[in-house]
């Protein structure tokens, strides 16, 4: 199944990239556990990492600090490695309210969640790829450190089928039910199977557009074929096939029975403790809830909130780390932590918040103490489990520098020849009027401006002031969710408005080549918003424009300002030297705006499989890119209905066309959520 990594790119490594690639590869081959790549904005860090992956041929996990950046990286990696398995592993919840108890008001909040089926399918596809092949790049968010089904149990539960195998129909159906597939002879969808005489059709949970047909004859597997579930068109026949469980959390029956006995023992011990402390209500509540869960597990093999019993189901001891995506990564895997100065602290913070909530549930009799072991990994456990790691950041944190022994691989020179922004320090007294005149200079030549303030009040007042003076301005604040934020960024790039005002403004992440000026108000007020790292990241937002400039308004130069200015000057000088030596003329980036919400061109190009007559599909992405996630979801439901109608009328050409449109819309929906 495994192929070799093949890197597809119109460019060759240039600037600092060849040296960075060589040093990273040498470090990995010498067995260095930690390396840091200091790559400035626009220097092609992702391309460098893609080259390292292609040269070393090792399965890789890329950790991003949020879904937005993960989607962007996934799109880029998909374009670099179209022939290999590039997978996406982020939280599959569109909405998630964990169960919680508020003692002060005696309020119990039930767990409530809405699962995005398409992302769930992509998660299952990611683990399947890691188990089956080596040419895998998984782009993940911090969701990767949360508990996942045990890989050993997951492997045990698989159903292996080969042509000529002796197995009767009922045994296959029983095994499919154990894998949590449901029988549905009418609506054939992901995670279901249907039976027609001696033919069983299975729609694998990790598949998006291919189903399996099992044809039996006299208790023998006569033929295995892969077909298009919409049109019924057989794509190919295969000698063997492995059906993976519908969820990561499936458990063999004998393990469930054993777990139930262990849960009963813990319940008996916990009841004694609660009764000894005269907590009668809590004891009664815990007994009732646990007995109900045990009954459900006995009858169905699972229950609502079964993850709270994960310690027993995976057979781990008290306090042991939960199985996570890292358990699926091969021992010689590679870990790349993007924007490490943000991602590393996130990994450390997840465990504490989760524990505080669960301790209250345990104390008041809503959960057994073992529920505390259904948790994200602690930071120390992550460190112990992480394979060889490359930290990637324009501003590495103290942790990464310490782990790398102070050795940093520099990638300061940009292949495009673009220089770091020119930095000017100007007095605070006239900052608003000075800013207004600078904005007018930029808007006259169709360039954009970012302004970062220290307080919400200041941001609101400044927005109002600029509006009164006829500027097209928007204000970005913490109440705006990820999707709306991406829409605002897209509108800024498209020129719907010219000035974006915010507080902790867009430091790590999305590229905005149209921004030529970054103005930092009150830059001389020391604090986390004006630290060296924050200043460098904010200044970097103007580094993709040929006329990039950063203005720091302050009456004195603080140590953080001095370091940020010094570091930017160092990078600027190094780039200038390189440009002169190689006769490079800096070129501005011209990045399509549509790219923000799409997950790489590779995803949009769906093939019309085996149907030569299929008409060219209208690119759903172009008009759909304007839509909000809610509108996208509505459009998806609408098209699904039309597709089924065409399929029932045997109009397979039209149904297939709509299916291809749905592919594109779903990718846009993932990026937007």
Curated annotation (Swiss-Prot):
One of its GO terms (cellular component) is cytoplasm. ATP binds at residues 39-46. CDD domains: DEXHc_UvrB, SF2_C_UvrB. It comes from the Bacteria. InterPro entries: Helicase/UvrB_N, Helicase_ATP-bd, Helicase_C-like, P-loop_NTPase, UVR_dom, UVR_dom_sf, UvrB, UvrB_inter. The UvrABC repair system catalyzes the recognition and processing of DNA lesions. A damage recognition complex composed of 2 UvrA and 2 UvrB subunits scans DNA for abnormalities. Upon binding of the UvrA(2)B(2) complex to a putative damaged site, the DNA wraps around one UvrB monomer. DNA wrap is dependent on ATP binding by UvrB and probably causes local melting of the DNA helix, facilitating insertion of UvrB beta-hairpin between the DNA strands. Then UvrB probes one DNA strand for the presence of a lesion. This is UvrABC system protein B. It comes from Klebsiella pneumoniae (strain 342). The lineage of its organism: Bacteria, Pseudomonadati, Pseudomonadota, Gammaproteobacteria, Enterobacterales. The gene is uvrB.
